């Protein structure tokens, strides 16, 4: 009954809350009542006064953002690496796009391009001097685009799910060459907060707050003249509902940035859900993070193909608890038809036997996935060079350098990877060091690299037969007790075959990758306690969070049985008959924890003893005592 009253008050007070919000942004009211307090309170009539807003101000990059301390607008500080990397990628994308138009961008902290002096012939020097004089005489000056200024020929950016507007404001303050940035969100609270933060950072000339459904907003910009040059999608969970609209609303050759935080689905914990959202079956394997990237790329390309468009991956990152892809979208019927060759589907794969030829187990089939390179190494090199030349631009520059360095070392034409612990645990042997396994592959004339998605990954073009031969040779140096292996186990089947390749585990100098030698920050340690995906933003604010925490505490271990003491356990075990006592082999006697009592024979109701005395007896009354032969 009390819950229904609170809901009724919430509906009656909604117009009052909207009026208070409007007065605040017009500057007529110095303070804004807490929406959560007004929803859970009694209104302005008098019983309970609204509480003041408790806000938190954070500084990230060049932006300063104020947001409610209660969980009314989503914000996760752990994703600062995601936002820093996005700013770096869009900056290089703007450099490429505007450079084709003769516009040079200026990034704070970057040094001016130095002229390189080269040896020229006298005739070439005269031509260069004449050309420079002509340019100076005509008065043509190179056009530039600076940070925080409107570039009429610049990029039109959309952030479909802006929340507090932090990402859009950082674009306006840190990325040069922008024409406008649309910060959209479907929540009225979030849009009000975006407006306030835009005014706080003085970027109203660049950032345009918008309250609309992200899908409808993108569908309304399908015309070629209205499309966005950059679309950034960072939803809470899966971006699948927004992909169809996004591939239509991005301009020709435009940049599409997509984040997926539903890694439990993409990593194979729910194959049916993954197929319904992305059109592919995920495998629960050690290479699940790279497979998640390839599933997302396949899903993007599949949706773009419906509109005679296709995607070209620039950068694909698996970090922390999410994956992030940066792709360019183009139009072309011929390329769309070629997309059928850059995805692998289990239905059209090479013919194989029902069981694996190496371990004897059944195959795991997944996909379809993107089978082509997931990075543009030239573009990655440009981003890496820009971040390395200006390390003070981002707070996570050190990690960006490390991750991008590992990506440049990856084998682009080798999908997925193995892991050291996976190989050694399969045959139950000791794990070789990373340098030993890499050296053995290099000695056998195979290529090998790391993967940014996993710390102990081995990405190689060696076939599975050669890799298992190397592991068989390693097992001979650290023998496994064969008598303990089951004849049907994968370890027994693999080790029962003699290796055809003699592995050489001598350490090679080129086995140690450059990023490892330089000690770059390649893999992130836990940034803070209880880090990871944050809970969804709720209108109830902090009160709702406290109620949810209390509910979690009360339901903790609800399905688990209470622990039993020794007496309860002994009594429970005495209800089970002892199997060895039945066989006559139990030697524990009364010390046995199971029952030695003979089982009580069950007498059916139809089995009446053939005895004249019993047949002449009258039925027993309620007061009669129990007699032998009746009970």
Where are the model-predicted features located?
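SAM-dependent transferase fold signal centered on methyltransferase-like domains
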Residues: 2-631
């Amino acid at each position: 009954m009390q819950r229904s009253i609170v809901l009724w008050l919430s509906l009656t007070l909604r117009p009052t809350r909207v009026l208070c919000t409007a007065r605040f942004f017009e500057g007529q009211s110095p303070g804004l009542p807490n929406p959560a307090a007004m929803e859970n309170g009694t209104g302005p009539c008098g019983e309970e006064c609204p509480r003041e807003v408790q806000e938190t101000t954070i500084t990230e990059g060049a932006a300063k953002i104020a947001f409610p301390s209660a969980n009314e607008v989503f914000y996760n500080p752990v994703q600062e690496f995601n936002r820093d990397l996005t700013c770096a990628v869009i900056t290089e994308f703007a450099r490429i796009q505007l450079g084709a138009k003769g516009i040079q961008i200026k990034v704070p902290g970057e040094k001016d391009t130095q002229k390189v002096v080269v040896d020229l012939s006298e005739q070439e020097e005269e031509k260069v001097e004449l050309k420079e004089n002509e340019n100076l005489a005509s008065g043509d000056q190179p056009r530039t685009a600076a940070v925080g200024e409107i570039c009429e020929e610049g990029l039109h950016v959309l952030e479909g799910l802006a929340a507090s507007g932090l990402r859009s404001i950082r674009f306006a303050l840190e990325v040069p060459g922008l024409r406008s940035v649309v910060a959209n969100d479907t929540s009225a609270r979030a849009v009000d907060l975006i407006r306030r933060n835009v005014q706080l950072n003085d970027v109203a000339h660049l950032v345009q707050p918008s309250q609309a459904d992200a899908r409808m907003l993108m569908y309304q910009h399908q015309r070629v003249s209205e499309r966005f040059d950059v679309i950034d999608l960072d939803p809470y969970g899966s971006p699948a509902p927004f992909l169809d609209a996004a591939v239509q609303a991005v301009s020709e050759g435009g940049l599409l940035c997509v984040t997926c935080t539903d890694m439990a689905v993409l990593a194979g914990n729910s194959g049916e859900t993954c197929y319904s959202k992305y059109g592919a079956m995920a495998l629960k394997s050690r290479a699940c993070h790279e497979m998640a990237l390839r599933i997302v790329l396949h899903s993007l390309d599949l949706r773009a193909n419906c509109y005679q468009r296709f995607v070209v991956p620039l950068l694909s990152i698996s970090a922390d608890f999410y994956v992030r892809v940066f792709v360019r979208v183009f139009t072309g019927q011929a390329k769309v038809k070629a997309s059928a060759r850059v995805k692998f589907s289990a239905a059209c794969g090479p013919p194989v036997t029902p069981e694996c030829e190496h371990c004897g187990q059944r195959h795991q089939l997944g996909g379809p996935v993107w089978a082509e390179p997931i990075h543009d190494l030239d573009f990655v090199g440009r981003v890496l060079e820009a971040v390395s030349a200006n390390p003070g631009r981002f707070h996570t520059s050190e990690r960006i350098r490390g991750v991008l360095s590992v990506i440049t070392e990856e084998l682009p034409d080798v999908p997925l990877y193995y892991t050291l612990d996976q190989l050694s645990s399969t045959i139950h042997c000791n794990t070789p060091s990373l340098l030993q396994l890499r050296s053995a592959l290099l000695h056998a004339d195979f290529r090998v690299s790391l993967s940014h998605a996993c710390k102990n990954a081995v990405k190689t073009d060696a076939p599975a037969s050669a890799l298992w031969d190397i592991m068989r040779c390693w097992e001979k140096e650290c023998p496994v007790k064969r008598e303990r292996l089951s004849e049907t186990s994968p370890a027994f089947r693999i080790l029962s075959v003699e290796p055809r390749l003699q592995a050489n585990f001598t350490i090679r100098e080129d086995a140690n990758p450059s990023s490892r030698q330089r000690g770059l920050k390649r893999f992130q340690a836990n940034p803070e306690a209880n880090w990871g995906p944050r809970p969804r933003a709720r209108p109830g604010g902090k009160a709702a969070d406290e109620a949810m925490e209390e509910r979690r505490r009360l339901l903790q271990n609800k399905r688990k049985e209470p622990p039993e003491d020794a007496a309860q356990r002994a009594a429970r075990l005495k209800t089970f008959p002892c199997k060895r006592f039945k066989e006559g082999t139990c030697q524990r006697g009364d010390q046995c924890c199971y029952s030695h009592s003979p089982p009580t024979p069950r007498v059916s109701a139809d089995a009446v003893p053939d005895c004249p005395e019993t047949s002449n007896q009258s039925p027993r009354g309620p007061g009669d005592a129990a007699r032998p032969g009746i009970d």
